[in-house]
């Protein structure tokens, strides 16, 4: 059964490693050392719920409801554009230290709300967990399916906690004005690139719905 566990671990790692909204947010919270462990835990728990839903049958709901998929897609586009704009605004600020200090004033609940939006308004998360993991894990028997799910969940927990702790450890080097400008520019570009990709997918889905 360990072979199924390591298959899930490898696939989960491959899907979670690329820089996306979730990883960027966890990394930034780690650099700020601001509730970064809590955010890593909440991201991992969110992934646990999504992975279990995808592997144990939830994928059918999303795939059979094109309107729900369209709603998630365009909600994700709007959020990513807003999040990217905030990153660009910080990067272009004449006094980036002051802009970063303003971000640090955010309360716990606002940070949690942003984390939930970054996770649950990202259609790529549903495609990864419901479509990819659902199609692969859903074909397995009950016991192998559990080990496969455990492997992918382990990848999420290891990655998010590792990323948060590594970012916090490197914080003194990454908190400089130059580093903050570069990080925010990269995050803004990635967020807008993903938003454009999602918008293209959303237009294709809309054309399919109304054709």
Curated annotation (Swiss-Prot):
Per the record, what ranges lie on the membrane's Cytoplasmic side?
1-38, 92-102, 171-173
Q: In Gene Ontology terms, what is a biological process of this protein?
A: L-arginine transmembrane transport
Per the UniProt record, which residue ranges are transmembrane?
A: 39-58, 64-91, 103-130, 141-170, 174-200
Domain remark text: The cytoplasmic N-terminal domain is important for ArgO function in vivo, but not the periplasmic C-terminal region. A pair of conserved aspartate residues, located near the opposing edges of the cytoplasmic membrane, may play a pivotal role in facilitating transmembrane arginine flux.
Consequence the record notes for mutating residue 128 to E: Retains transport activity
Q: Where in the cell is it found?
A: Cell inner membrane
What results from gene inactivation?
Disruption mutant is supersensitive to the arginine analog canavanine.
Q: Which GO terms describe its cellular component?
A: plasma membrane
Topological region Periplasmic: 59-63, 131-140, 201-211
Q: Which family, according to UniProt?
A: Belongs to the LysE/ArgO transporter (TC 2.A.75) family.
- Report the catalytic activity: L-arginine(in) = L-arginine(out)
Q: What is this protein called?
A: Arginine exporter protein ArgO
Q: How does it assemble?
A: Monomer.
The domain of life is Bacteria
GO-annotated molecular function: amino acid transmembrane transporter activity; L-arginine transmembrane transporter activity
Keyword annotations for this protein, in alphabetical order, are: Amino-acid transport, Cell inner membrane, Cell membrane, Membrane, Transmembrane, Transmembrane helix, Transport
Mutagenesis / variant outcome for changing residue 132 to A: Retains transport activity
* Induction text: Transcriptionally regulated by ArgP in response to the accumulation of intracellular arginine or canavanine. Lysine has a negative effect on the expression of argO.
Report how it sits in the membrane.
Multi-pass membrane protein
Pfam families for this protein:
LysE
Query: What does this gene product do?
Result: Involved in the export of arginine. Important to control the intracellular level of arginine and the correct balance between arginine and lysine. May also be involved in the export of canavanine (a plant-derived antimetabolite).
């Amino acid at each position: 059964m360990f072979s199924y566990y390591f298959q899930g671990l490898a696939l989960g790692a491959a899907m979670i490693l690329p820089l996306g909204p979730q990883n960027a947010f966890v990394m930034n919270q780690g650099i700020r050392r601001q509730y970064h462990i809590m955010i890593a835990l909440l991201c991992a728990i969110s992934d646990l719920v999504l992975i279990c839903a995808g592997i144990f049958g939830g994928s059918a709901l999303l795939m059979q409801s094109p309107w729900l998929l369209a709603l998630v897609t365009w909600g994700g586009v709007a959020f990513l554009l807003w999040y990217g704009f905030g990153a660009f605004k910080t990067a272009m600020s004449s006094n980036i230290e002051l802009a970063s200090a303003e971000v640090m004033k955010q309360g716990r609940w606002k940070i949690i709300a942003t984390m939930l939006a970054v996770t649950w308004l990202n259609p790529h998360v549903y495609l990864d967990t419901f479509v990819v993991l659902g199609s692969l894990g859903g074909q397995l028997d009950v016991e192998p399916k559990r080990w496969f799910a455990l492997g992918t969940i382990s990848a999420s927990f290891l990655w998010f906690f590792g990323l948060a702790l590594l970012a916090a450890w490197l914080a003194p080097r990454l908190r400089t004005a130059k580093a903050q400008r570069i990080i925010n520019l990269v995050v803004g570009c990635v967020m807008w690139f993903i938003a454009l990709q999602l918008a293209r997918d959303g237009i294709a889905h809309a054309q399919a719905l109304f054709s």
